[in-house]
């Protein structure tokens, strides 16, 4: 059986919290920001949790996290 490996692209995008939930960054805040309102950009700051329907696939990409 081959070695289990972490998908490095997933490891750079997700972090596992102490409670076991997975943290992700917000999308839509890299470019084309002039047409977005200040409120919209402010609400995109910070992090969010991965939805429960996607948690299993994210954990499969990071077997050692």
From Swiss-Prot:
Q: Which UniProt keywords apply?
A: Ribonucleoprotein, Ribosomal protein
Does the keyword field hold Protein biosynthesis?
no
What gene does the UniProt entry assign to this protein? rpmI
PROSITE patterns attached here?
RIBOSOMAL_L35
Residues in coiled coil: none
One Gene Ontology term of the biological-process aspect is: translation
- Region annotated Disordered sits at 1-25
Name the UniProt record assigns to this protein? Large ribosomal subunit protein bL35
Species whose genome carries this gene? Bordetella pertussis (strain Tohama I / ATCC BAA-589 / NCTC 13251)
Among Pfam families, the record links this protein to:
Ribosomal_L35p
């Amino acid at each position: 059986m081959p070695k289990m490996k972490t998908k490095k692209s997933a490891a750079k995008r997700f972090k596992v919290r102490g409670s076991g939930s997975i943290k992700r960054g917000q999308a839509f805040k890299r470019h084309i920001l002039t047409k977005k309102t200040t409120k919209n950009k402010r609400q995109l700051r910070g992090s969010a949790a991965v939805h429960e329907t996607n948690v299993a696939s994210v954990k499969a990409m990071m077997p050692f996290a």
